[in-house]
Amino acid sequence: INDSVRVITGFRYTEDTFSSDVTNFFGLNSYLIEDDLEKTTGRIAIEYDLDDDTMTYLSFTKGFKPGGSNLTFGYPVDDEQNFGANPAPQLVFPIFESETIDAYEIGLKTDLLNSRLRANISAFFYKYENLQFQSTDPDIYRGGVANIPESEMSGLEIEFLGIISNEFSFDLRLSFLETEITSEYEALDNIRAELYFFGEEPIRYTLRESIKGNKLAKSPEFNANFGLMYEKVLSSGKLLKATAEVVHRGDFQQRVFNNPFVDAVDEYTIYNLSLSYEISDKIGLDLIALNISDEDGVNSSMTDVFGVAGTGIELIPPRQFMGRLSYNF
């Protein structure tokens, strides 16, 4: 618009077609699942330079994740008797809907202290419709993708990059996050439903629960990363680099059910060190220590929705010491 104000925008038109011929579980029945999707998405942002060192911005983005077909899903009630099962309403359907997001963000980027400190700060709000998640049906061994009608996410991200002296610099990154399922929605936790088998589908259906007010999956409320860097050219002319790092990952829920025995993943903090030395113009040496305190932590976990109800846990790596010798040709 002028030297201080800029408008950035872009749009995307998507056409998506899928078709699935599903025949499973002894081939007793076959389903042809197909659909066509069309969606227009885009982004618009306004940037404003307050001065030569400071820029603010405001943006709106509409995003889209296409829907699709499930390989397993609840039997329609009309088909229940063909399999000797008791009728129960479906919770997982042949087709799951497209997920959409309206994302709002406001931010500030500025250089301070004669450009020795850079600050990047942003606040955001995301509104989801038909959020896709892994769900379970009352029918045995039937799970797939379902949709949560409405949910929200809001947060704040702060980043500082600073020069302390000719040799020392640092970076600090903080993120704060709040999430919530805002619509009334009932889903079946397969951890609870696993106690019941063929012929007990109506009982499984009664175990469905409202997840309104629950937190979204895999969304830590607080993350932090701090790094202190040292870099110096020695009297020999060789370059020496050293880095000390602290990484904190906050606790979160691994599923939208927020089951305290299965879904709660604890926070952890780890410490890392690295040292790099330029032996010659072509040879370099790196010494690295990761997770120095040998912290026990869970990186992620996943609970199967297709019948066995098992939960797999991915742990963070234990304490590690590594050395690396490099040669530049």
Give, region by region, the residue ranges found by the protein language model.
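Solvent-exposed loop segments that connect transmembrane elements
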Residues: 18-37, 68-95, 133-146, 182-212, ...
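Structural signature of Gram-negative outer-membrane beta-barrels, strongest in the C-terminal barrel
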Residues: 1-127, 229
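Outer-membrane beta-barrel strand-turn architecture
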Residues: 1-3, 40, 48-52, 100, ...
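Gram-negative outer-membrane beta-barrel transporters
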Residues: 3, 123-127, 146-255, 328
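C-terminal beta-signal and adjacent terminal beta-strands/loops
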Residues: 247-257, 276-329
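Residues on the lipid-exposed face of transmembrane beta-strands in outer-membrane beta-barrel proteins
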Residues: 1, 44-48, 106-110, 158-162, ...
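Repeated loop/turn-to-beta-strand initiation elements of outer-membrane beta-barrel proteins
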Residues: 4-7, 53-56, 114-119, 167-170, ...
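Transmembrane beta-strands of outer-membrane beta-barrel pores
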Residues: 13-19, 60-66, 75, 112, ...
